[in-house]
Amino acid sequence: MDVMEALVTRRSIRRYWNKTLPAGVLEELLEVARYYPSGLNLQPLKFMSVAETEDVTFVTENLRWAGYLPGYEIGVDERPVSYILIFGDRQISNQFDFAAGSAVNQLLLAVHGKGLGACCLAIHKKTQILEHFRLNAQRFEPLYAIAIGYAKHGATTVDLTSNCKYTLDENGDFIVPKRTVSELTIIK
């Protein structure tokens, strides 16, 4: 798949098959992650791969899934098999927005390129994540969790007509409205 195809076909995946990733995939993704663009080349992010069942369960239960779908819960048999957690390192910088956005996109595309599914979820329960992994709260700020696994559902895009909320079709696949190019373009 070429880069343009990857950019257009990558969708967020929120349900996964319980199938182990091939050996070395998380390490390869971490290697790719380190090339994220960073202002002043500060590289203020740290990454943690999470693959132990207990840790994956903990992270899954401390994230908010599919916020537009009231009552949506990810089934025990549909959880991702791994995560890459992204942290800001305050010993390097207190500004993470640009770097985190770049790193997230880099990882999502790399996962897609491996034929896997992924979803980026903001970490809101920062204290719980820090305590569970015994990390220094003064130094590290939990930012995002990239859920990774084999996709158990599909996702298609449609032109946005009324609102941007995604929905599920009769097969449980996500329908994701996207703004048209003309709606996104500023003409002077």
PLM regions with names:
Residues 1-188:
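Acidic, surface-exposed loops and disordered segments
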